[in-house]
Amino acid sequence: NQIAFISLEDNVLRDDFLDIYNHLDTSHYSIKKVLIHYDKKSVWNDFLYLLNCIKQIIVINTSHIVLINDNNYVVSHYKRQGVKVIEVWHATGAIKKFGNAIKRQYPINNYDYVIANSDYWVEPYSLAFSVDKNNVLVTGMPRVDHLFDETYKEEAKKNFYLKYPKLKNKKILLYAPTFRGN
C-alpha cells in the first residue's frame, strides 16, 4: 500500500501534491516522499541527482502508486510492471508543446495516467506523455479546487482589497505564466 510522491522541483510537498496528500487516508497507506530541489547546475548537484535517481529506482519499484509532477527519467526507463504512475502535471493546460510533442533527450514512457483540467487537454496530454486517451483523467486540478469555494473567494477578495484599496472598482487583469526559475 505504498504511495510515492516524486518531485525534482521542490523539497517539500506543495500545490497539487499537498492537496492530494491531505486527502489520503494515511493510516491505510505508507507514504514515501522523494523530493529534491536544485538551485543551480553544478557538479555537486549532478552528483545529488545521481543519488536521487538511485533512491527513486528503489522507491518507485517498491510502491503501488507513484505520483509525479514533471518528466521523470527513472519512470521512463526503470519502472517495473505493476507499479501505477500518475502524472499530476505542474501546468493546468498545454499552451506550448512539451513532453513527447517536442524533440527531447529521451522519450517519456511508462506513465499510466495523467490528470487534466478539461476534455480540451486530453489529446495534447495523451501525445505528450504517451498514454492512451482513456487514461487521461479529466478531474480538474487539485490546486484550483478551492477557487470554487465561495467562502474562500469572498475571503480572498476581502483581503486583496484591504491590501490594495485603490484597485476597488477597477478592472483587474491577471497574467500568470509558468516560471520555475530554470
Language-model-detected regions and their locations in the chain:
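Conserved catalytic-core segment of nucleotide-activated headgroup transferases in glycan assembly
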Residues: L13-H23, V144-N182
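Active-site and donor-binding regions of nucleotide-sugar-utilizing enzymes
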Residues: A4-T151
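Residues that mark the start of a beta-strand
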Residues: Q2-I3, K84, K170-L173
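A short, compositionally biased domain-edge/stem linker segment
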Residues: N1, N72, K158-L162
